[in-house]
Every structure is written in structure tokens, then in C-alpha cells.
Amino acid sequence: MKKLFAALLLALTFNSQAMAQPRTVKLRVIQTSDVHGSFFPYDFINRKPKAGTLARVSSYVNDLRKTYKDNVILLENGDILQGQPTCYFYNYINTQARNVAADVVNYMKYDAQVFGNHDVETGHAVYDKWIKELDCPVLGANIIDTKTGEPYVKPYIILNREGVKIAVLGMLTPAIPNWLTENLWSGMKFENMVTCARKWMKIIQEKEKPDVVIGVFHSGKDGGIVTPEYEEDASLRVAKEVPGFDMVLFGHDH
């Protein structure tokens, strides 16, 4: 886990319908990605203290919220359910309790969670339960339910901050079949990210008319595995080829 979080400042100047003069709204956007169960400042595998965990990020975010209040947007970009013994315990042993990954995401008050390939790796019983336990929506516009033809989880969310309407679109690398057996993702298929982004950008712009569109993709910048069926790391392609994004955040490749 080389890259746990990124913080960006988005300053917007726009004309409010209720005001004659334009005004500037500053939003602090925080992304965490590829946490791999590093919730606490201790490595339970190697049995030693651990830096760069969500415990530290939580302190940082709490400090930001003192200044920016509700203008802090906190986004989790996948691969959170797997990686430490604490995850294994709640995924497969103490399955009656709420998953620790849900407790942490809820405690930190994330605005949205994106699916990662290692989240899919845990299997339906684990991630379907986890989705229900979260206070925020899980996003994955290109994760398609094969029975309905619709996204398996929410494709996007709308956030409102000081009159600014923000759309957040989430996607997952479609290379899942390269790594995981079908029993782990039965009833699902994974669409090409560029095609999916074009489709949902049109829907979002026509239906929601947002001031800002943020893409949050559990897919690397570029490269990775490329086959006739899928492209593993397509975040840069989406940013270049799909007009409308004000910010694109990516993960997966650490």
C-alpha cells in the first residue's frame, strides 16, 4: 500500500441564481484507495506498528472538517475489504457482526465508497452484506447485474455543498475475470470504462445538470492488462476521451 490517500482543493467560481455577483466555493476532496485492511496503526501480519493507516487519515480529515465543515468530500476508492487478519476475521469468522470495514467507513463519514477488485475477491456473501451495512452508497456504474441489465450498485451520487451540485461517478476495472473465478462475481459483468463513462456522463448532465463532475475509478492510470475483452487501467483514457469531468481520481495500481 504505497498510496493511501490524496487531498485536493477544488475552488469553484459560479453565478448563483439567488445572487447577482459570482462567488467562490472551496471544496476539499479527499480520496483514500487500496487501504487493504490497514485501519489501525498496527500490522497484525508482521506484528509491529504501521504507518499510513486510516487511523491517521481520520485525524487529518477531522482537522480539515474543523476548517472546511461540510465542504470536505471524503471518497473511498476500493480494495478495503481484504489485506489484514482483522478483515479475514469479520469476512469469514465473525460473520454475524457488522464488518469492521463498514464500521470504519461509517465512523469516518465517507460520502461514497467505490468497489475494488479485491472487494469482489471476498465473494458475494461478504460484499453483499457489507454494502447493506454502509451508511454511504457503494458506486460502480460499469458493474452490471446480468439479470436486470442495470448497475449492480449505484452508478453515481449527487452531493450538494453551499449550492454547488456535485456528481460523483464510480467505476471498477473491468479486468476482474483475469484474476477471479466466476463464482465470486456470479450474476455480474464488467463494462468497458470509456463506453460506460460516456453513457453515464450523458445521463448525469441531462438529468442532474451538475456544477461539478468527479470520476472515482478503481482502475490504474494507464497500461496494465489489455485484451480484446477488457482494459485494466483506463482512467487516463476516460479523462481524455469523455468530456465533462472536472476531476478524475484513480487507484488500483498503487
Question: Where are these predicted regions, by residue range?
Answer:
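Bacterial N-terminal signal peptides
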Residues: 6-15
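Positively charged n-region of N-terminal signal peptides that target proteins for export
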Residues: 1-4
